């Protein structure tokens, strides 16, 4: 079971280079497999959009919480580490031009030695997507096409590649360098909806269900696997990433995740960990319980 840790942006220190490096280097030294960074290009004050992972419909983060660009943050971390995986959770796909994003992801993956894993989502904040020039009502279709665009560019050779889609088209496009893996940067799909589960089954290298547990989680995994089968894919080939908190992670949690077919768990600090030292203590205790180092 691979274990990752989520950047504790709740502390309000994710824009501080010393804090970022201490967190990342500690995670690597303790034996964690990856760190994961979140994205919001902008946060709209007093947004009318409902945050789907809170019973109040409001995000637990203040509007002025520092949220660095995740790819820039991971590039910074890549140069200061040697083994640590570099993940997003999630990158809001409709905020990005996929031609440019393909180059950015390939560059990060190449220069980090193939350590990149990207979790994409369609986003929940209408105003953010619109501020980035996207269409909230078409965000599912644009995400599907973005995945196709990036994979086409990564697979294209010296003669270039052609693409004709609903939102993007090009002829003879060459995009180098390529990702380290011939299959490209792994693209996981994150979300809580049936649409996200189906997208993961149809198109994803993995599925990262968010905010789900119990019967809802089992149902989402089943939807993903059915969609994979319907698309002619092997459902077992779609990786599954689950979540937990650092203090609750133990051997029984790993067994539970493995029974669902997961090979990776992303761990967050508890609400009690309100300082960096407290987060690092939870990480160290978890690493000792799981015999990581």
Give, region by region, the residue ranges found by the protein language model.
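Active-site-adjacent structural elements that line small-molecule/cofactor binding pockets in enzymes
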Residues: 1-293
């Amino acid at each position: 079971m691979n274990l990752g840790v989520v950047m504790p942006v709740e502390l309000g220190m994710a824009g501080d280079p010393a804090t970022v490096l201490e967190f990342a280097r500690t995670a690597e030294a303790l034996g964690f497999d990856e760190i994961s960074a979140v994205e919001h290009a902008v946060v709209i004050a007093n947004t009318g959009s409902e945050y789907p992972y809170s019973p109040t419909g409001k995000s637990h983060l203040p509007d002025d919480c520092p949220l660095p660009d995740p790819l820039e943050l991971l590039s910074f971390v890549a140069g200061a580490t040697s083994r640590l995986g570099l993940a997003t959770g999630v990158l809001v796909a409709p905020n990005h031009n996929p031609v440019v994003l393909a180059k950015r992801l390939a560059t990060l993956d190449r220069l980090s030695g193939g350590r990149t894993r990207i979790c994409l989502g369609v986003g929940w904040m209408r105003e953010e997507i619109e501020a980035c020039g996207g269409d909230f009502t078409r965000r599912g279709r644009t995400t599907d096409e973005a995945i196709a665009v990036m994979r086409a560019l990564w697979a294209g050779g010296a003669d270039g590649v052609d693409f004709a889609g609903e939102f993007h088209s090009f002829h003879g496009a060459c995009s180098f360098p390529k990702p380290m893996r011939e299959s490209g940067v792994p693209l996981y799909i994150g979300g809580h909806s049936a649409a996200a589960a189906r997208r993961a089954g149809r198109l994803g290298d993995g599925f990262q269900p968010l905010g789900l547990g119990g019967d809802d989680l089992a149902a989402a995994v089943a939807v993903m696997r059915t969609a994979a089968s319907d698309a002619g894919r092997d459902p077992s080939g779609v990786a599954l990433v689950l979540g937990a908190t650092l203090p609750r992670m133990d051997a029984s949690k790993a067994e539970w995740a493995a029974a669902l077919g997961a090979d990776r768990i992303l761990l967050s600090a508890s609400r009690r960990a309100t300082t960096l030292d407290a987060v690092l203590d939870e990480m160290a205790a978890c690493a000792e319980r799981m015999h990581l180092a």
